[in-house]
């Protein structure tokens, strides 16, 4: 693998959906890089720290939210003079989202009183009251024509289906949940999967018109669903429960029939299990010193005993499945079981059996499959990156500033699978699965020198707003000015 040097940032970074650009926030500025050559394309500067930024789905615009001031600003990558500012300082902003057409923006007000939908084309605004959440349970159909929204009224849960053309209400129905926690929409847009609170062991399936298709309650007592994920082919629903099991359900059947329970409460692995176990171990010098921080993987012999977290032993093996990651081809599922927090379980869906266990020295913080091939990246809050392929496992040392040791805790892939970000709270590295000539390491000092070419701009005034369909006109006017 090939890596950049360490880059300091303020905790916010993202590839554009088309993988062409990389945006990195540095407190009061957002810097746009060409993802292939890592050269600065644009730099947007502000007086307030950026709370959140989002790429538009078409990768042409970027939205910045400033929660403290209640202002949202949108900039164009191709035309830096195009600016849209939305001022919600009176009601406040706690989150923001794009619509699939990249021409409307959702803003969520304080206390989830309402959400506002702002059009970048005609400046119109639509308001929807009582969204239950500001950061989840807002879904769009595969074609982007409809939106499903979880709502809460008079202590009861509802789902509203809206047409995204004008956000008119298409259907509205109550769901039989105690406290709706999560919402999934199948890729064929025919089924809405409703997850109840972890205090209940239940999930339900509805049609977008409000008809109940299925209801499942695997057991009666104890905590319920911790994590829910659809497979990439949308054929299988995977639910991580607090009893240490991963349950798979068939989305192709009308009743969402349960396929299997995959139990993580495993004490001993034997030859009969046909499971490969890789364990990370420290490398000792000939003197026996282990303080060099170098580690390696060893393939374990059988029988092999898994060490359960001591704090959870008294709970009789109870623990949540807190991470579920499907491979691109939906042939493998990687999971984390909180009672065995140092272990990665990899399940093979063709056999419905455990394929591999990776035992780390430190608890798993994050893991992500490549969007293009079966490569799994794993981080454990240290200066190493762990990779799993169908053939082997590898440990990669991450080089960083000696004064600021790297503690990798976050992962993010570009959609084309050619690059990824591994980061902690203050610094990040850009990695490439294969070493290509055009993806050579770069020097952050060179980037800083390029940034100085960009003029520091004052905060944007609200009246500097141009509808989306006027971008070309602005470009033409700018060209005319240059000719003069």
Residue ranges and their predicted role:
Residues 1-484:
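Long, low-complexity intrinsically disordered regions enriched in Ser/Thr/Pro/Gly
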């Amino acid at each position: 693998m090939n890596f950049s040097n360490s880059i300091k940032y303020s905790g916010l970074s993202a590839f554009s959906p088309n993988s062409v650009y990389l945006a990195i926030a540095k407190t009061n500025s957002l810097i746009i890089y060409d993802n292939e050559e890592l050269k600065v394309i644009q730099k947007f500067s502000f007086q307030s720290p950026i709370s959140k930024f989002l790429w538009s789905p078409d990768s042409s615009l970027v939205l910045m939210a400033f929660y403290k001031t209640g202002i949202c600003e949108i900039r164009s990558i191709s035309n830096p003079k195009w600016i849209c500012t939305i001022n919600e300082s009176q009601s406040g902003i706690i989150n923001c989202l794009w619509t699939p057409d990249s021409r409307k923006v959702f803003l969520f007000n304080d206390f989830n009183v309402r959400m506002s939908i702002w059009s970048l084309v005609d400046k119109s605004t639509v308001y929807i009251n009582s969204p239950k959440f500001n950061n989840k349970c807002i879904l769009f159909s595969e074609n982007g024509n409809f939106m499903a929204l979880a709502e809460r009224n008079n202590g009861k849960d509802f789902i509203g289906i809206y047409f995204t053309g004008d956000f008119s209400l298409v259907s509205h129905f109550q769901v039989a949940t105690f406290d709706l926690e999560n919402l999934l929409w199948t890729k064929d847009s025919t089924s809405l999967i409703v997850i109840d609170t972890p205090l209940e062991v239940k999930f339900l399936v509805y049609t977008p018109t409000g008809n109940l298709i299925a209801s499942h309650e695997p057991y009666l007592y104890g905590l319920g669903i911790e994590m829910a994920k659809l497979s990439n082919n949308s054929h299988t629903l995977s639910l991580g429960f607090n009893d240490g099991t991963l349950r798979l359900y068939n989305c192709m059947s009308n009743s969402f029939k349960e396929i299997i329970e995959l139990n993580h409460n495993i004490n001993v692995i034997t030859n009969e299990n046909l499971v490969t176990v890789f364990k990370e171990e420290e490398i000792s010098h000939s003197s026996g010193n282990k303080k060099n921080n170098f580690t390696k993987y060893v393939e374990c012999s059988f029988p092999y005993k898994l060490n359960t977290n001591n704090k959870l032993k008294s709970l009789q093996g109870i623990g949540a499945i807190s991470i579920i990651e499907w491979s691109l081809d939906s042939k493998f599922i990687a999971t984390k079981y909180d009672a065995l927090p140092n272990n990665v379980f990899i399940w093979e869906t063709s056999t419905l059996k455990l394929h591999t266990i990776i035992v780390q020295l430190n608890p798993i913080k994050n893991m992500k499959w490549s969007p293009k091939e079966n490569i799994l990246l794993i981080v454990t809050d240290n200066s190493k990156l762990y990779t799993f392929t169908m053939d082997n496992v590898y440990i990669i040392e991450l080089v960083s500033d000696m004064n600021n040791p790297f503690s990798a805790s976050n992962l993010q892939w570009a959609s084309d699978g050619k690059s990824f970000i591994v980061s902690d709270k203050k610094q990040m590295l850009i990695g490439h699965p294969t070493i290509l000539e055009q993806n050579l390491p770069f020097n952050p000092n060179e980037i800083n020198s390029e940034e100085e070419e960009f003029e520091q701009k004052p905060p944007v005034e609200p009246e500097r707003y141009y509808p989306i369909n006027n971008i070309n006109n602005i470009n033409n006017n700018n060209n005319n000015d240059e000719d003069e």
